[in-house]
Amino acid sequence: MDKTNVMRVLDQKKIKYTPHYYDNTITNGMEVANTLNLDPNKVFKTLVTIGASKRNYVFVVPVNSELDLKKAAIAVNEKSIEMIKSKELLDLTGYIHGGCSPIGMKKPFRTVMNESALNYELVTFSAGKIGYQVEMNPNDLKKLINITFSLII
């Protein structure tokens, strides 16, 4: 299988990861977890939002959970946040819906991952392309992006 830009970044930074591949017709996070036989608590989805200040933020939550917009707003000191429209995702991040990764976005955005990720040695999330996931230590994300961990679900 080809490597994605996310995988190349991880290779360049010498960060250990395990790639996972699945049928690229699957875009639902729970289906991805089931297909890969992974615990859905350890498989994360990447969500892009906009705050009342018009700043964009990235939130990374387990696929079996929903982002709590109030908790998310508090985590980034915003009055409120809302999800961006799907059609804005590609121009803003360089990724499409179902293939959005917290690593390698067009611009660096403040990113918050649900604190439950820290309960696990390894978590899995999109490698930047539908059909590709990377499994890695959540603490290693700090070496790559501006990320904090907070209760956002």
Describe each model-derived feature in a short phrase:
Residues 1-153:
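Extended, low-hydrophobicity, polar/charged segments
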